[in-house]
Amino acid sequence: MPQTRLTDRFGRTVNYVRLSVTDRCDFRCVYCMAEDMTFLPRQQVLTLEEIARLARNFVALGTEKIRLTGGEPLVRRDILELVREVGTYGLRDFAMTTNGSQLPTMAESLRKAGLQRLNISLDSLDADKFRAITRTGNLSQVLDGIDAARDAGFRGIKLNTVVMKGRNDEEIPELIEFARQKQVDISFIEEMPLGEISEHDRGLALCTSEEVRDIIRRHHELIPATEDSGGPARYFRMPDSEVRVGFISPHSHNFCSTCNRVRVTVEGRLLLCLGNEHSVDLRRVLRGHPVTDDKLQEAIIKAMDLKPERHHFSSNGDVQILRFMNTTGG
């Protein structure tokens, strides 16, 4: 792995890239997108070859960790071909975030293709609540997907739960017990103010990480984990389990000072910060210079100067970023 060349003006090293492969999804989660979402025209979406080229050049610039995101990555046709290709790039960490719906049939193939870790969204263990949050999701299918991932030999499996008051906050103890039973880590996430939603008031629904910890501590002691997560989560352990409990707290405890990541949307926009609109059009560079990579790497390096010191999310429920999470890359 080469010495990184991606450093922003605040001295932060950027070695983690989240690549969105689609804005489409078979769910319509209330915190992620509108129910009648209009998806991008095909011609605006990067080809899998373009995504692989981006990944290859980020690795050439020192990237050690790549996560494939969406939308739902597993609804992208021929996604296994991309996984096989990126899996040959010598990454320290190669992961995917998924809603789990396609894992019953795809988990084993993903593991054999070289994917190392999976983050699986699980916002409820109640079938009716799960359907209400996802609008279209089938809980049993996702639970089967979690089992399929374990059976396929994935050792780095983590559950992600977006906690919302009045929707799923009372399920926190049950979700902890489920993670302990399955021997997988779980992270609780404060809802992020991306895109205008109508299902609930984000300010009223916000459940802070400290509130979640207070609920868990009624049942389990939480001991801060010593290892570096390499991401935004702050991890804790329980004395009687190897399972880690993580907290991603963009509102109550932002992780900006140690931010080591950027995102590329499926349109090829390089986003320097989840909570800012600063971006660089890498699709134009990819298609304008299809043969050589010099201009592409130059654009990526130069873009680091645009990375802001921090985001400015507020907890009042207002929309701070107009783009939805599915177009950002979850």
Curated annotation (Swiss-Prot):
Kindly give the SMART domains that the UniProt entry links to this protein.
Elp3
Q: Name one GO molecular function term.
A: GTP binding
Look up keyword Lipid metabolism and say if it applies.
no
Q: Which PANTHER family match?
A: MOLYBDENUM COFACTOR BIOSYNTHESIS PROTEIN 1 (PTHR22960:SF0), MOLYBDOPTERIN COFACTOR SYNTHESIS PROTEIN A (PTHR22960)
Domain Radical SAM core, residue spans = 9-225
Q: Which residues bind S-adenosyl-L-methionine?
A: 31, 71, 121, 192
Q: Which reaction equations make up its catalytic activity? A: GTP + AH2 + S-adenosyl-L-methionine = (8S)-3',8-cyclo-7,8-dihydroguanosine 5'-triphosphate + 5'-deoxyadenosine + L-methionine + A + H(+)
Tell me which residues bind GTP: 18, 67, 97, 158, 261-263
Provide the cofactor list for this protein. Answer: [4Fe-4S] cluster
**Residues annotated as binding [4Fe-4S] cluster 1:** 25, 29, 32
Q: Which GO terms describe its biological process?
A: Mo-molybdopterin cofactor biosynthetic process
Q: Which residues bind [4Fe-4S] cluster 2?
A: 256, 259, 273
What protein does this entry describe? GTP 3',8-cyclase
Q: Which gene encodes it?
A: moaA
Subunit (UniProt)? Monomer and homodimer.
UniProt keyword annotation of Membrane present: no
Key words of the record: 4Fe-4S, GTP-binding, Iron, Iron-sulfur, Lyase, Metal-binding, Molybdenum cofactor biosynthesis, Nucleotide-binding, S-adenosyl-L-methionine
Q: In which pathway does it act?
A: Cofactor biosynthesis; molybdopterin biosynthesis
Q: What is its EC number?
A: 4.1.99.22
Its annotated function is as follows: Catalyzes the cyclization of GTP to (8S)-3',8-cyclo-7,8-dihydroguanosine 5'-triphosphate.
Coiled-coil residues: none
Q: Which family does it belong to?
A: Belongs to the radical SAM superfamily. MoaA family.
Q: How is the cofactor bound?
A: Binds 2 [4Fe-4S] clusters. Binds 1 [4Fe-4S] cluster coordinated with 3 cysteines and an exchangeable S-adenosyl-L-methionine and 1 [4Fe-4S] cluster coordinated with 3 cysteines and the GTP-derived substrate.
**InterPro entries from the xrefs?**
Aldolase_TIM, Elp3/MiaA/NifB-like_rSAM, MoaA, MoaA_NifB_PqqE_Fe-S-bd_CS, MoaA_twitch, MoCo_biosynth_MoaA/MoaC, rSAM
